[in-house]
Amino acid sequence: MQRPGEPGAARFGPPEGCADHRPHRYRSFMIEEILTEPPGPKGAAPAAAAAAAGELLKFGVQALLAARPFHSHLAVLKAEQAAVFKFPLAPLGCSGLSSALLAAGPGLPGAAGAPHLPLELQLRGKLEAAGPGEPGTKAKKGRRSRTVFTELQLMGLEKRFEKQKYLSTPDRIDLAESLGLSQLQVKTWYQNRRMKWKKIVLQGGGLESPTKPKGRPKKNSIPTSEQLTEQERAKDAEKPAEVPGEPSDRSRED
């Protein structure tokens, strides 16, 4: 039987080159000694620590919190500033700015691999690119076409206007239905016709307008049929009456 000390005896210990996995023996039961890591083999600790630190810095919170070198920060800032100042600030109507933004701005048409631009320049480019015909813009309201009345409709309106300068709602409805027009068309025509009538009255020697400032008729501004007949009788009475025995002007001339 061979003893462990003899040359041919079998060795049950760890092979050479392998780490010793024997449990660490504590000298005391102090908390500081328990929490401290056991000392590793000489020379392997610095390399393992550096490798572990490198792996931790690739991913996770450590990578975000790790401080980057100052020179790399400075290089990135200089590159961004150079990319920004390639495009000068100009008003929105400048065509050169719109072409530059469309060629190099990300998010704009034709921007492939170009450096990013500030938000202000991107918004300016999009505002310039938007044309007036796009759905985002509001279209102007077109003017209403002017109503073309027929001769029969004009005759009916004029005939009614001679009798009645102002129409009530029932009268307007009846007139519109009889002439084949809408109430709005009749109302508009009456308003324009009254304005023309007021100008004619003022130009004919009238000192005051036949209507009030708000458009309401004044009292006795529109003569009635009875007043018209009385005026005709007064004009006939002013003419000189012919004497039966005297010859007329025509007979004297003969």
From Swiss-Prot:
Keywords: DNA-binding, Homeobox, Nucleus, Transcription, Transcription regulation. Transmembrane segments: none annotated. Residues 142-201 bind DNA. One of its GO terms (cellular component) is chromatin. Signal peptide: none annotated. GO terms for molecular function: DNA-binding transcription factor activity; DNA-binding transcription factor activity, RNA polymerase II-specific; RNA polymerase II transcription regulatory region sequence-specific DNA binding. Residues 230-254 have a biased composition (Basic and acidic residues). Widely expressed. Expressed at higher levels in testis and heart. Detected in craniofacial tissue and adult iris, but not in lymphocytes, fibroblasts, choroid retina, retinal pigment epithelium, kidney, or fetal liver. Residues 1-20, 204-254 are annotated as: Disordered. Its main location: nucleus. It is found in: Nucleus. InterPro entries: HD, HD_metazoa, Homeobox_CS, Homeobox_TF, Homeodomain-like_sf, HTH_motif. Transcription factor, which is involved in craniofacial development, in odontogenesis and in stomach organogenesis. May have a role in the differentiation of molars from incisors. Plays a role in suppressing endodermal Wnt activity. Binds to a regulatory module of the NCAM promoter. This is Homeobox protein BarH-like 1. It comes from Homo sapiens.
